Amino acid sequence: MYNFSVPDICDEFSDIQIGDLFLNSYGSKNKFFGQIHTAKCEHSNSIVKEFVNEQGEGKVLLIEHTGSELCSMVGDQIAQKAYENKWNGILTNGCIRDVEIIQNIDIGSVSYTHLRAHETQF
């Protein structure tokens, strides 16, 4: 694993964009990087499932969640599948669940936390 710090990267690349500071790290990898692949989701994580079922070596999945904060985009099964297919990490402005399990999966996972599955209807 490469050693790097966010301030050093910002110093070297002045046009870099930094994510929200209130996102939390949940996977066992606190630092991860790779080619970004973006999934835009509203109320279903079906496209996320499609992405993590593909080979992900050297890649990071960025989930742009435009829907309600009352549902999750990532759970333990998706995180496990991403790990099995060698994704470096998952970053989302949406919510995840099963954080107690995800923290033991060797993958980077940065997001908000939520307890409900995406299928929950209100």
Identify the function of each model-found stretch.
Residues 1-35:
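Intrinsically disordered, low-complexity regions enriched in acidic/Ser/Thr/Pro/Gln residues
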Residues 28-32, 52-56, 83-84, 101-103:
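Solvent-exposed alpha-helices and their adjacent loops that cap or buttress functional pockets
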Residues 35-41:
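Short amphipathic
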Residues 45-51:
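Surface-exposed ligand/attachment interfaces on beta-rich extracellular proteins
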Residues 51-81, 85-93:
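Extracellular/luminal Protease-associated
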Residues 67-68, 95-99, 115:
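Acidic, glycine-rich active-site loops and adjacent beta-strand->loop/helix elements
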Residues 103-115:
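Short, hydrophobic/π-rich interface segment
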Residues 114-122:
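Single conserved hydrophobic/aromatic residue that forms the stacking wall/gate
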